[in-house]
Regions:
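Short, well-structured active-site flanking segments
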Residues: 128-144, 261-270, 378-381
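Small-residue-rich helix-loop
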Residues: 104, 315-468
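Active-site SXXK
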Residues: 99, 113-131, 227, 252-257, ...
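Hydrophobic single-pass membrane-targeting/anchoring helices
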Residues: 1-39, 190-193, 468
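C-terminal region of N-terminal signal peptides and the immediate post-cleavage residues
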Residues: 20-60, 134
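A small/polar active-site loop signature that marks catalytic segments
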Residues: 223, 232-380
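Mid-domain, small-residue-enriched loop/turn segments at the edges of structured enzyme/sensor domains
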Residues: 88, 146-175, 182-225, 232, ...
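Beta-lactamase-like hydrolase cores
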Residues: 41-110, 178-191
Length: 468
């Protein structure tokens, strides 16, 4: 399917979600009428969508009077797809409007969630920090003469250059922060300054003991600190991730200060428990909003950013900025929002830990909460769900005959570990009914790649049928 067609379908689904927030009496008229289908392009046969693909001329807006899919019909279609000798498959499909269970395949059985766990982290961050909150990185005058304190506020998407207001990664720049600092100092620091780093907002171990050392070595994650550039990713392709991203960012900041005429004397030091006497702020830059960072985290499945946001959410509840506090606050948050947490185990906040245990039913409840809940902060997580065949971690998927019906329509968070594949999200079916779903594959003997087409086909089946 052409990218433009996928984009149009994705746009229709976005409008459909927006319509959910509009009272039915106001939305009495159809939300819109889709343009007529364009002439069929000449494309390779292998890329042609299947005959079951919903026609582009069908209005893709949720219809309050659209019939729910018949559970028996849905089971007849999904069970053959979600049956495999290679591994264990579980799943659940809910009607978004009513919460009715339309499909259940051992949905309450706990399974390893992989990066689908980031949906829990997203909800905790949005609820406890606020969608429009920005994270500040500041420079203060230290308690000792000639000393500056670089205070970390949790922004790990800092850029090395000037602040880029239109970006999420690099929204706040260290060069802009340094320029403000030099201007505030005037000519009083020509002889140099000493730079101290205050990253005391986080506590506890920087590396979670539940993470596989192979994942750390491979760069799937790095030690977690509340300050970093580019989410602690290397500047050069093939480079290694910093083992202390906060110190690396502070050293970069010191280098920039030197280039601007304020040399930093000696090595960058650390303020172990903050510097309470450092109260005069000289300069500050602010990150993209929490909602924008959550969307970036979900779209790119950014493990480091997920861990940081979860710890910040804990501090938002006056808890320590530790990994243990982060998972505890996430669990308490989703429970308070009505998610059944029976059997739910959170060992980290990114989904890398094999000790995590979440059921498909719990993911379906969480997605329903995001899509139809009345909390405006939490609803902002919708922007982070990748669109099948179009964006994020789903960009290169849904291009086969079995899955093309979901291209541009399925919006879901992906999850991948060596023997784990998961997919949780939402889709508008052919009759205009909004469905939420979670499909989970664990213990696949041939690896996670064996499970991926099964999960994608299951989600595409929801998009392509009315199932009545």
């Amino acid at each position: 399917m052409r990218r433009t067609a996928r984009a149009l379908q994705a746009g229709l689904l976005a409008l459909a979600l927006a319509a959910l927030a509009v009272p039915a009496a106001i939305n009495a008229a159809p939300a819109f009428i889709a343009p007529p289908s364009p002439p069929a392009p000449v494309i390779p046969a292998a890329q042609l969508p299947p005959a079951s693909l919903a026609p582009m001329g069908v209005a893709a807006s949720p219809k309050a009077d659209a019939a729910q899919p018949d559970p028996a019909r849905l089971a007849a279609l999904l069970n053959p797809i979600l049956t495999s000798d290679a591994g264990s498959l579980t799943g659940q499909v809910l009607d978004a409007a009513t919460g009715a269970v339309l499909y259940d395949r051992r949905a309450t059985a706990a399974a390893v969630p992989a990066s689908n766990l980031k949906l829990f982290t997203a909800v905790s961050a949005l609820k406890n920090l606020g969608a429009d909150t920005r994270l500040q990185t500041s420079v203060l005058r230290g308690s000792e003469p000639g000393t500056l304190v670089l205070r970390a506020g949790g922004d790990v998407l800092l850029g090395a250059g000037d602040s880029a207001p239109g970006a999420v990664n690099g929204h706040a720049g260290l060069t802009s922060l340094a320029q403000q600092t030099v201007a505030a100092l005037g000519g009083s620091a020509g002889g140099g300054v000493r730079l101290l780093l205050d990253d005391s907002v986080f506590t506890g171990a920087a590396l979670n003991p539940e993470w596989d050392t192979g994942d750390v070595t491979a760069g799937e994650i790095a030690p977690v600190f509340p300050l970093a550039t580019n989410s602690a990713m290397p500047d050069l392709k093939g480079g290694s991730r910093p083992q202390d991203s906060a110190l690396a960012a502070a050293q970069l900041f010191a280098s920039i200060l030197g280039k601007l005429g304020v040399p930093v004397q000696g090595a960058v030091g650390r303020v172990a428990a903050g510097d309470p006497a450092a109260t005069e702020q000289l300069a500050a830059v602010a990150s993209a909003t929490v909602a924008e960072q959550v969307a970036y985290m979900l779209q790119n499945s950014d493990n480091f950013l997920a861990e940081v946001l979860a710890r910040l959410a804990a501090t938002g509840q006056q808890r320590p900025g530790s990994s243990a506090a982060a998972t505890a606050v996430t669990l308490a948050t989703v429970k308070s929002l009505g998610v059944d947490v029976t059997g739910l185990t959170l060992a980290d906040s990114s989904g890398l830990a094999m000790a995590n245990q979440v059921s498909a039913a719990q993911f379906a409840q969480l997605v329903k909460l995001i899509v139809t809940g009345d909390d405006a902060n939490i609803r902002r997580a919708i922007d982070g769900f990748p669109v099948a065949g179009l964006s994020g971690t789903l960009e290169s998927r849904y291009d086969t005959a079995e899955t093309a019906a979901g291209s541009g329509l399925v919006r879901a968070k992906t999850g991948t570990l060596n023997v784990v594949k998961t997919l949780s999200g939402f889709v508008l079916d052919a009759d205009g009914r909004l469905l939420v779903f979670s499909f989970m594959g664990n213990n696949f003997s041939g690896g996670s790649a064996v499970a991926q087409p099964l999960l994608d086909q299951a989600a595409a089946t929801l998009a392509g049928c009315g199932c009545r």
